[in-house]
């Protein structure tokens, strides 16, 4: 058994139903919330209210209605824990097609590989190779409701096969289904004193669906999927035909119960908190008011992302962003930088880089992310 197994066990520990004193909210398939494209990554891991791009399927499919192109495809690759291993990664492929000026459809496949694990129970045995992985397949339909506003609905299938069968015969692959509801507003070009501008806003309630069960044991624990609410807005300053600067802000909240049930030791002392075992719909509504410390802790469950994107001639881009999460809820804090290029043939290439500013090490720290897109006119 090699050292990679220890890394995999560390990653899979996120499925543990118990949370320690920080009361971090845990879910199954957390990779669903990881930014898979370099543009959004360069803007502080956000995209619900940015301008439309080929990866809008993940952030807000309603944006496709405002695309100037008829269809497009995109690919991305993100190494994970690249400082420790070289075969854990997140990959994504997305496609969209505008049926008309009022409607569009889109789809994507996201695949998260935890790499190959060689397991030896006896040094003389032939290694048994395990390949835990997770993937999702989704499709969306978007409809323009007015000149400036569109909404979309998405359906998603989730599969999580993270069992190590040779070590644990009581676990199995888990699956679920989910839906998303999103909306996007983009104003007309408005003239101001010395510049033009476009106002944008968006929301996305994603991964609304049943919990996942990994245990074969009857009555075994089920894990919530990461139902999530994104709210964002932004403004693009257009200084002339070649130069523009877009500012965007996004707020996120997980719509799953907080760890609020006390776990006691033999002396009756509180040693941890765990999530209540309730239905996923009840959990969504309960998530707005179940934190043990009341409204103050509910506010701490919000994450914030701020991004800047400078565009020259709509062909060269420089990006920067900041992401912040409260220490009690995970303490993810990082700065992101990125760049992008777009050719006359609508080929786009984007790169981003993450720099952690927290004591908590990010698995994506010092990782270069790459994404490619191509539009068809």
Predicted regions and their residues:
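Subset of outer-membrane beta-barrel
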Residues: 20-377
